[in-house]
Every structure is written in structure tokens, then in C-alpha cells.
């Protein structure tokens, strides 16, 4: 029979009692983590969010409490009252913060029982993630998950406190708004009052936060929930949380300083240090050095060693002249046998494809014709990577377009991008040897970077049209506007856009916004949008821009991703309380589900089966 709590009150948590509390009479409450029955003595490990405390039920001390303990099983909810006593020296458990004490219970209440759980929260590793998600309330009891949400709380609190101290107002923007697709599909909400019309859940608060700047709010932030109906990947969720902010009259550096400030505060809140200010790098330079717009600075940059080749050497090696020849350094790669070298070379060639040639520098060194060339490549790569020389235990991979390759008609960025993919693949492949990704407990574990000056437009190969690289409310560079490049040279237009990157992961993206209606309409036209279409989709915003809109800009960073990195979690699902699967299903509540015909009729909807 279950007991009532009555007037009992918890005096301490299961994680706070220490040897200094010995002799005190206390009451703790929690879940039975483990139970060990030794006849007249029963040991219950009682668990709550704060830790675990051992409770001893001695039949000689209280037969009634001992009898209750005989009924208790894992995950029963228990209230235990008794005296704190120091454990004997041999019974101390150094692995537990409460390991020096135990509770000699004189009273035990069973407040609730439990079915046999499909897994125990005491288990350190649970292989089946679907079972964890179905029984999320059990999964969240696990210490690892409790830790993740402690980190999340501390990060969000630190961000709020920092931004509030910098004069930002936290303002909530609507969940139910109009559909203005920003690249992904909207989640739509049918209106009962307006048949055939729909609200949309926000993909971001983008236009509302810009309107807040038009409203004179000056500095806004929000821990914002966002929704995107897109194809899911391991690092995506249909609903997610971002740290969203906007400012009036900023320069890019103003925004950078604010972001660096709240990130430093957030990392410090969980005991981590970072180095500010973050380095800056243009998009073009990032592509040239790393082959990607979100570089991982923990690995050495790539080097274009084209200048060390003579025309005769290029011809002999059948390399396309005038194109990059990219050297990739893999640090601390141990020596390979001839068989391993052959297999390695084959693997590299498979990864880079038929258009690119792989040059084995060690093989060049053994050739009388190319031995000096190998030394020149080494010297160029070492200088660029700020090494005295390319050490013997470093592996140098050099790739370049083959003579006559079909792709050479394209711009040179494709070579850097392909080399960048190879650099990351090799970096992961040999991580155990170069140890660049291992944490050392210093600020160097977190390699931040600002990437700036992105292209404004991207060419869409499917539609054969230019589309926006960030979003259509990003301001182009002033010089590009004045030069008329929006109409004459769209590939050359730069955006006042910036990303903040950490260890090769994009944490956030932002920009200086368009604050003039004429420029905004010009951008819409450049994207192939007619004035009528722009008015239909964004008329309310174009109207607002006519009422003294100040220059403004902002950024949004993924809170879930920041917490995932700080908690050392392997997936966003580990830091979101009730996440969806890769198929956008909530296994715990079994959503989405069909709804009744009556509900559909109220919404004037008739489903069609595909």
C-alpha cells in the first residue's frame, strides 16, 4: 500500500550531505536507484537531480521501515527520514560526493511505485535510442541527461544576464504569423475563422526583429523557438532554439563584440575559457586556405604550391596550368609501409575523383627529375603552415586538376573546395595519430572564427537562376551597390554577412540588414521577383521600411548546438528535452497523429491520401 506525503518536507537533496552533517536528523526524497538486500540490512541508493545518497534500513533500528524497504524496487519514489552517520573507513565510496556518509533510516514512506522500466536510469550506456525517446521521462532521469540540461540552463541564463547588462530588451515575437518562406518549408497552421487561410510557424523572427528596430527598440534579444519543415539530418531538428539579437546603428565589429562577450560569459558559466576577440577571415580566404566556409582551425591550412612548379614540370606531370596545386599537411602521421602508401594513394585518388591528380611527394623525392621539386613543395607548405619544416612524421598530400580535366572551365574555387573535403576526411581518418581534436583543458580547445564578406548571390544549377546566399534582407556591400553590380555582375556582389564558426561547426549567422525600401525592392528584382510578387509576400515589411528605418543588423546562434558542444553530447537530441527522430516523429507522445473528421471539418480541410 502506498503512503501519503502528509506534512513531510524535504530537508536536503540526495547530493548535498557530507561528513559535516553527521548526527543530524534529515529527510530526503527521490527514486530508488539500486537496492541491495542483506537480510536484516537493506541498502537503498536514493537518487534525485542532485546526486545519490545511500540509505540503510536496519531491522533492529526500525522493523517498520525495514519492512517498507523490502517492498521497494528500482524507480519507486521514496521518502526517508533518519540520522546522518559517517561510514566506516573501509565503507567509504570515493566515487560518490556523498560517499563518506549514509542515512540510518528510522522512517520510510513509499510515495509511488513503478513498473519494471524498459531500461534503468542507472545504466551508463543505452544502445537503443528509440527506446530512450519513447520513454523520455525515464531517459531524462539519467545523470548524463540531467547534466546536459544543467549546462543548457547555465548557458541560457548567462546569455540573458550578459545581454540585459548590455542594454538589450528581451522581446517575444509571434509564433503564429504569415508564410514568408526563407529557404525551407513552413509549418502551416490552418485558420478556423478564415477558411482556406493559414498561419505559419516562424522559421526565424527575422522580419519581426527588424520591425522592432524600426520601432525604436534599439537593442533586442530573444531565446527564440523556430520551426523548419526540412529534410532532417543528424544535426537538425524541426523545432529548435536560437539566441536571436538585433541592434540599430551597428558596425559589424559592434555585433562581433557583443557575441564574443555573451559567448565568453556562457562558456565561463560552465567552467570553460575561450579567447576573445575571435580571428576574422573573409569567405574567399577561407575557401583558399580551408576549402570550406566554416574552417576547423585545429588542422593546418592548405597551401597553393603552384608557384614552385615550372612549366616543364607541369607538362611532365600532366597537370593543368593556371589552376591551383593544393598541398594538405596531415600532422603527426606515422610512417607507412609501401603497401600502406599504395593503399593510401588509391584512397585519396578515389576521394578526389577523376578530375584531380594526386601527387605523392615521397615518390617525387625518389625521382632524379623531381627530387628538387619535392623539396620546394615541402618548403612552401611548411612556410604557409608556420612550421620550420614539414617533419618526417607529417604526411603531405598534393592534388591538382589533371591536364584537360573537364572541370577546369569553372573558377578555381572548386579545386579548393574538393581539397577542403579531402583535408577534413584525412583529418578525421588520422585523428588518433595527430590528436588535434583531443581536448587539453585550455582555451585552445575552442577555435573560434568570424567568416565575413560572403557572396551575396548563389547560382542555382537546377533553376539556372541566382538566389540569395543568406536571406534577401541582407545588405550588399556599399561599393557593389554604387558600382551597379546587382545588375551587371551578380557573381561579384558581396554581402555584409558573417558567420561565427567553432571547430569547423557554424554556430550562427548574421548580417547588416537593408534599411532602405528602394534597395530592398532592387534586391527582390535581382532575385527574379516581380514588384507585385514582392508586395504580395512582403508588402507589410516594404511599407514599414518607408517610415524612417535606421541602419540595423544582427545575428542568430543555435543554442542547441552550443549546448551540445559544451556538454560533450553526440547529438542535438541529447540536449533537447523532447526531440523528434530523424523522421520528425515524437516517439513519446506518438506525434504526428491523425485527427478526427470533426476537427478537420471545423478547419475546412479535407485530407487527400497520396
Curated annotation (Swiss-Prot):
Stretches the record annotates as Aspartate? 206-209
Sorted alphabetically, the Gene Ontology BP terms of this entry are: aspartyl-tRNA aminoacylation
Q: Record's Pfam families?
A: tRNA-synt_2 (PF00152), tRNA_anti-codon (PF01336)
Q: Where in the cell is it found?
A: Cytoplasm
Q: Which UniProt keywords apply?
A: Aminoacyl-tRNA synthetase, ATP-binding, Cytoplasm, Ligase, Nucleotide-binding, Protein biosynthesis
Q: What is its EC number?
A: 6.1.1.23
Assembly information from the UniProt record: Homodimer.
Q: Give the family from UniProt.
A: Belongs to the class-II aminoacyl-tRNA synthetase family. Type 1 subfamily.
Do you know which PANTHER family this protein is assigned to? Answer: ASPARTATE--TRNA LIGASE, MITOCHONDRIAL, ASPARTYL/LYSYL-TRNA SYNTHETASE
Q: Kindly provide the name given to this protein in its UniProt entry.
A: Aspartate--tRNA(Asp/Asn) ligase
Q: Which organism is it from?
A: Acidobacterium capsulatum (strain ATCC 51196 / DSM 11244 / BCRC 80197 / JCM 7670 / NBRC 15755 / NCIMB 13165 / 161)
User: Lineage of the source organism?
Assistant: Bacteria, Pseudomonadati, Acidobacteriota, Terriglobia, Terriglobales
